[in-house]
Amino acid sequence: MKQSGGTEAQKRRAGKQAADAVEDGMVVGLGTGSTAAASIRELGQRVEEGLDIRGIPTSYQSRQLAREADIPLTTLEEATPDVAIDGADQVAAGDLIKGGGAAHAREKLVDAAADRFLVVADETKLSPTLDIPVPVEVLPDAAPVVQRQVAALGGEPTLRAAERKDGPVVTDNGNLVIDCAFGEIAEPAALAEELSALPGAVEHGLFVGLADEILVGTDDGVDVR
């Protein structure tokens, strides 16, 4: 269910502006996805110029990018993020759907722990309402049970299949992902609460009320929301 689109220039603008908010001595949550990757690369350039920071990656991808950029890494056990910079698959009225890269459980953990959470996105991610499928990470044995529970909530669950191998997508945590289509989500907070209560569900991709700022890259600059 990976969401793509937007121009690379828009992503770079949003990513750079978020990276510019990082100050010397900060601990930074490093998000996952193409726009968050732009921030990681920008932070790497600033580290090369002398910026003293530590990063907490949210996925294998962001960890590898940070290592390539020579950003020193730490963990939530050792430090609390001053700021987290992460992307989104869809943005509506300040709320997000994430998880196209199957990293939303770790992303939410780091993003929610940060003193300040900056979302970076391009214009294609903006929507009047949240309406794309919501990823739910589940314990492998719980997948059929959660699928039935999601259907009972009015959703259409689909076990996410891997693109380059046979079988399902397996997360960095060793779990599976069910993409749950609900159509237009009129009350994201209520749905988030229902999904969180499902036995066997590890984490869902609704990020409700977590973002402090949303930086949207445009052709002319960055729109801050």
Curated annotation (Swiss-Prot):
The active site is at E107 (proton acceptor). GO terms for biological process: D-ribose metabolic process; pentose-phosphate shunt, non-oxidative branch. Its EC number is 5.3.1.6. Residues 1-20 are annotated as: Disordered. It catalyses: aldehydo-D-ribose 5-phosphate = D-ribulose 5-phosphate. SUPFAM superfamilies: D-ribose-5-phosphate isomerase (RpiA), lid domain (SSF75445), NagB/RpiA/CoA transferase-like (SSF100950). Substrate binds at T32, G33, S34, T35, D86, G87, A88, D89, K98, G99, G100, G101, K125. It comes from the Archaea. It holds the Pfam family Rib_5-P_isom_A. GO terms for molecular function: ribose-5-phosphate isomerase activity. One of its GO terms (cellular component) is cytosol. CDD domains: RPI_A (cd01398). Keywords: Isomerase. Pathway: Carbohydrate degradation; pentose phosphate pathway; D-ribose 5-phosphate from D-ribulose 5-phosphate (non-oxidative stage): step 1/1. Belongs to the ribose 5-phosphate isomerase family. Homodimer. HAMAP family: Rib_5P_isom_A. Catalyzes the reversible conversion of ribose-5-phosphate to ribulose 5-phosphate. This is Ribose-5-phosphate isomerase A.
